[in-house]
Amino acid sequence: MATQAKRPRVAGPVDGGDLDPVACFLSWCRRVGLELSPKVSERAGGRRTRGGARAALTSPPAQVAVSRQGTVAGYGMVARESVQAGELLFVVPRAALLSQHTCSIGGLLERERVALQSQSGWVPLLLALLHELQAPASRWRPYFALWPELGRLEHPMFWPEEERRCLLQGTGVPEAVEKDLANIRSEYQSIVLPFMEAHPDLFSLRVRSLELYHQLVALVMAYSFQEPLEEEEDEKEPNSPVMVPAADILNHLANHNANLEYSANCLRMVATQPIPKGHEIFNTYGQMANWQLIHMYGFVEPYPDNTDDTADIQMVTVREAALQGTKTEAERHLVYERWDFLCKLEMVGEEGAFVIGREEVLTEEELTTTLKVLCMPAEEFRELKDQDGGGDDKREEGSLTITNIPKLKASWRQLLQNSVLLTLQTYATDLKTDQGLLSNKEVYAKLSWREQQALQVRYGQKMILHQLLELTS
């Protein structure tokens, strides 16, 4: 799915009149058997329901509150009493999930599943949302009331193109957004709009909008959940995304204190560490670098809080660095020959990247092999190529743990250093400039929210790259 964390939830896409959206949501939770804490239920008034997910409980949920108070952004959940690791926070019955299977047009979507296939795999869920949003009797209307206002989502796909490129140049976000926008337009024009036009009784004119479709894609990107496959199912297609009421209220933190568990009849949010009274409950969306967080969820974790942050070195940048070290046409030809060999080994690609974390190289095998092949003597490369890559399989022991990078061969370190320098040139600002903005609280406070978020992305990446520069010197 999804610190200013999630965007401020100012007004939902469904008009709820003067009713308290939290009270309405909690009342809805009781009706559908979504088990929250007793104190949450008491705040909303009324009796706690029986049945539903309650049968799945082995102990009552810990006492938590849905609130805007004490959260990093918008609605969140706060522990009203101390919570111990392993305690149950809430249970969501599968019948309360909003998906292509549980929506009121699930039968139609199932019959048309072949026609609705797409690159993203999200079209059926998005059509379910488009229908339920405009259906007066939708059973999820109280849930929609806690959604963020769709017109105020802060994903970079909604930023003006010039602002996006100016603030996020070099981070990889503008390129990812351009691909998203192209795919969204293509899916909408070729699949979604024709389907809605073929069923005008199910989709009113007001939901036949590319703008609304953009917004719902961003919402699904930030708030949906995708159930992981079991180990024996690894060969299957990934599960379709679903909307999980209550679970999507939680904000994200790398150092999270809760985790969503899946079972046959329900989904359970369980504390993974002690949570003191009054502290916010945080879920995790996985190990996400800041550029991924802002791209998919519209927020970042301020430096140095995101321990999962990474920086990318484009694979073609390493090739460019290797070419810069050549002096003759024969040497250039040999670099391309080595690169083609790496492509054949599926170690590199024109759009791939080597991913560097604060303490490890996440693409260790790919980078090790690339440095080895590009730097080995010509005769050794000929022998390796003649063996079709099946020669000496010994790995450089411990070669690309961050602390062992200084122990790499000098030629490897030089190529890696030159690649880092080329990567740093892709940013519009240098580390010193960004450092000055971050260290001056008055200047930082005057930046717009987007400028602050983009600065955090750039700075985190540059710190990793500069660490790599020092280690390769």
Swiss-Prot record:
Automethylated; Lys-39 and Lys-179 serve as the major automethylation sites. Changing K179R: Abolishes automethylation. Impairs the methyltransferase activity toward RELA and PAK4. It catalyses: L-lysyl-[protein] + S-adenosyl-L-methionine = N(6)-methyl-L-lysyl-[protein] + S-adenosyl-L-homocysteine + H(+); L-lysyl(8)-[histone H2AZ] + S-adenosyl-L-methionine = N(6)-methyl-L-lysyl(8)-[histone H2AZ] + S-adenosyl-L-homocysteine + H(+). It is found in: Nucleus. Changing K39R: Greatly decreases automethylation. Impairs the methyltransferase activity toward RELA and PAK4. Protein-lysine N-methyltransferase. Monomethylates 'Lys-310' of the RELA subunit of NF-kappa-B complex, leading to down-regulation of NF-kappa-B transcription factor activity. Monomethylates 'Lys-8' of H2AZ (H2AZK8me1). Required for the maintenance of embryonic stem cell self-renewal. Methylates PAK4. Belongs to the class V-like SAM-binding methyltransferase superfamily. Histone-lysine methyltransferase family. SETD6 subfamily. This is N-lysine methyltransferase SETD6. It comes from Homo sapiens (Human).
